[in-house]
Amino acid sequence: MSEMTPMMRQFLEIKAEHPDAILFFRCGDFYEMFLDDAVKASRILGITLTSRNKNADGSEVPLCGIPYHSCAPYIAKLVEAGEKVAICEQAEDPKQAKGIVKREVVKVITPGLVIEDASLSPKENNYLLALCCDGECYGLSYLDLSTGEFRVTELDGLQAALAEVTCIGPREIILPVCFREEPKRKEVAHVIVDRSITYFEEWVYDPDYCKRLVANQFKGATAESLGCDRLPTALLAAGAVLHYLVDTQKGHAPHVTCITPYNESEHLLLDESTRRNLELTATLSEGKRKGSLLGLMDRTVTAMGGRKLKQWINYPLMDLKKIWLRQDAIQELMEAPGTREAMKSLLAGVYDLERLNGRISLASASAKDLSALRSSLSRLPAIKEQVAACGAGLLKELDAGIDPLDELSDLISSAIVDDPPFVLRDGGIIADGYNQELDELRAISREGKGFIARLEAQEKGRTGISSLKIRYNKVFGYYIEVTKANVSAIPDDYIRRQTLANAERYITPELKEYEEKVLGAEDRIKDLEFSLFQEVREAAAAQGERIARSADRLACLDVLVSLSELAHDKGYCRPEVHEGSELSITEGRHPVIEDMHSAERFVPNDTLLDNGENQLIIITGPNMAGKSTFMRQVALISLMAQMGSFVPADKALIPLVDRIFTRVGASDNLARGHSTFMVEMMESAAILRGATARSLVILDEIGRGTSTFDGVSIAWAVAEFLHDNKIHAAKTLFATHYHELTELAVTRPGIKNFNIAVREWNERIIFLRKIVPGGASHSYGIQVARLAGLPQAVIDRAKEILINLEKGEYGEGGVPRLARGKKTPPPSPQLSLFGAGDDQIRERLKEIEVALLTPLEALNLVDELKRMI
């Protein structure tokens, strides 16, 4: 250490306090990085790695740097790579410093705490989430620092908590240090993968410490006043988030003004599997927004509205009155295209007020940000005028909450120029006429520059030296330059400042006096402009709560306009959402598939489900016929209805559903080491435990991951359980290839059979995509194989084997005789079914009362007799 320069010693001392972050060390107009930080940053950023000085052992010190005024894209790239960035600024004016300039870290930028647009997706929240537990009670809190949104909840059990984490989709997660150890480490592994993780020691979760953090952030507020008195574990998670803010932002987040507690009973619950299978916000195949329900429904024109719509999709309502309020607003806007288009046009000019407010409150806003705020506020009176003319209750509420902030708009308009520069310290930000002192300094500056031009002309005339020039540089200031050939003509009052190879440089008392006046004015102008800008920014920050409230109302309005436009353009109907059990859809359509294949006519279908005679629908039919599409569309229509949206149908009667479950596919869990069949059983078990009579269950091909007999048995038992157990008797759509399950409708009054209509023509099949009553008579697997492009030889051979199987011609070990080879000779006549030693089988058969056998019992009996042979 003693061999190092003072600045390098200072760097290492500060770096020791932030070992997990790349330290941006301010040196003049640059942020510099040294040692391992420099090596890592140069690789990620693709910038030149150089070196400075030498260590005591003669080795070079790696170095790289970036201009401080254009650091945002570099920081964004590092954060995107999962790195933390500690911003170390000069804490005093270098001109005033005695010795090395004091420096300190002013903030640490992490993936979950970015606020600059370069690091953010406009229509996605950027959440920092904390999770902790007290026994089986899991507390969860999450914060979007860029908008100030801060929410907390408690959940029963780790799986419910992890499902909520997946839904929230945080960019960074805070966990207690115990989550590093088994078994919790393994249980959360799939959720934390590819996310930035920070572990806190147990003392951070001390209740008293967390209460102090909450009180400090929210001006003395208590758990009771924040509505969190019944969420003690969630409050510990909130404390962890606030502790992280103290660590990284010096606790400075004035726009985070409240905590919003919520309970899972307030919303229709959707587990991770259901969200994925229904492709609510991203497609299964590529994880993209386009092709998802969100991609279809999002016609918002503001970033705030886009984020709000995603929340509405992820958290459908359980409150009928709130649903009806949204429906009323959508209907009014749908029926008033002129108003709707006017609102959309006005909203399109509103910037992201939530994130502008965040940067303003965190003192990170630029003059461009204030200009964007001014532009947005200028549109609010016209928006209010449009909304005020509407009659729907929710639109009236939004109108009351939209605050034009006239005084702030006027302040910014008078203070900030129309098109301010990006760099604050360059000046040119404050408008003429706003501040008298600034106007006077600008006049001096302009007059001084004019004086220089006049003085040059005067001196040329006085000396007769036509090549005389008055110039300026940062070292000498203003000077008069005369070539060597003309030195003899200079007056006596010229004072030599510098000798060059071909010229001499001079000053005069008059030039020096004006230099001090002009340059002093320019320095004072920049300092005064920055000070005035800070005052305006602070005035805007003081209105943070009003800005946030207006931003939220504008986001809601944007979503309502978007949904009304979608309903109008797509011919959606207003569903009748009710407290009963009947789910009736007339001519329902899958919203996304209908949109993606708009050139073709989507075949609509009716649906009837209830908790009585139509409680469980068995759907049979071939692959590709449309079973999965039909079931998913029922789930999506139910979800859209509880969002308050209109739905793709001619008519819809939708009951409030507490949960939607889906059991489709297994690709998600195979990477976790679970077999396809194990995934099926785990998800099925979760459904059977969690479903209620108010739930909607979608089951697609239960039991296909094991042997036929096992699969049929499990599928049959699952269907029976969902029908017979009244606590878990959810409204269920059950697609299957096991035609044996159609027999359930004979013995269970709440089970009905439906199939996908198919027509055969020239040994080919035509999918009619229509759901009709009754079970399917064939599975058409070979025809589907032909459509998929299997070689004709394989198709022909499959037909032969199928005929053989259907005739029951089996050889030893149950192998179809023809399946062992086409040239196998036909079997010799069999004289007796039983040999001399088959008395046991004969006796077993005598015990059977055929008339009383169910199809499932018959299948199990055949399997038993087969093992006895």
UniProtKB/Swiss-Prot annotation:
Binding locations of ATP: 621-628
Disulfide bond residue pairs: none
Protein keywords: ATP-binding, DNA damage, DNA repair, DNA-binding, Nucleotide-binding
One Gene Ontology term of the molecular function aspect: ATP-dependent DNA damage sensor activity
InterPro entries in UniProt: DNA_mismatch_repair_MutS (IPR005748), DNA_mismatch_repair_MutS-lik_N (IPR007695), DNA_mismatch_repair_MutS/MSH (IPR017261), DNA_mismatch_repair_MutS_C (IPR000432), DNA_mismatch_repair_MutS_clamp (IPR007861), DNA_mismatch_repair_MutS_core (IPR007696), DNA_mismatch_repair_MutS_N (IPR016151), DNA_mismatch_repair_MutS_sf (IPR036187)
UniProt-listed SMART domains: MUTSac, MUTSd
SUPFAM superfamilies: DNA repair protein MutS, domain I, DNA repair protein MutS, domain II, DNA repair protein MutS, domain III, P-loop containing nucleoside triphosphate hydrolases
GO cellular component: cytosol
Entry keyword annotation includes DNA repair: yes
Protein name: DNA mismatch repair protein MutS
